[in-house]
Amino acid sequence: MPVTVMTRDPAGASARLGLTAVHTFNFPRFLAVMRRRALYLNGGGSLIQDVTSRRSLWYYLFTLRAAKRLGCKVMMYGCGIGPVKRPGGVAKTRKVLNSCVDAITLREPDSIEELARFGVTGPEIILASDPALTLPAAPAEEVDAALRAVGADPDGKYICFALRLWPGFDKKAGVFAAAAAHAWEKYGLTAVFLPINHLDDGQAAALVAEKLGDTPHVLLPGPMSSALVIGLMSRMQVVVSMRLHGLIFAAGQGVPLVGVSYDPKVTAFLRCVD
């Protein structure tokens, strides 16, 4: 069966994966492709929510409905659900998911409760692990090289911070700096700032790093592959993360983790691993 990927970087995705790729917002091309496909796989992540924007929710609901109307089976895979807060959003979500989606796999019980609150009963609903837990780590030599490139000892003892910009973060940067200083002074752990999203996360890390003074710390550059992020996580003694995937990658490597919740999806995952 031919596979087509929807992405904001079609050329890059085609080069990396060897697959046909369509730009996320090329609607005529998307519709043309769906006419020739048997399955539309939507996911993963928290796509059915309106915190990002109402347009984001409307977009994903449109793709689900369009794929079904063009004759595809429709599956939502590895999803988190909600929050949906804006007027009309819950009703629209209920209508589309009940009429257009055949099956949904959810990554935490909170999302099952959210679908029940919406009144979604049409699709088959399955609770399953987040698929990111199965991603492999980069080879040890690649991880060693990444640490040496920033002057870090591959055999050192580290505490990882995976942070992101969020409204009010600048007022909390000192809290993370104090935690990093405490980890160094009491446990001999050097703070490593690891970007999951290299644009936003690098700025958040810089805000904290400038408050550390003489406390040893390492700023890892981005972007980097998910395999390298996972490999680096595996070298940490503990991971402190705002990023959901920072927590998922740490859990997958058996590394103790501390979640800092800015979004219900982070809280929901932490409940699963508690």
Segments from the language model and where they lie:
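Active-site anion-handling motifs in enzyme catalytic cores
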Residues: M1-D274
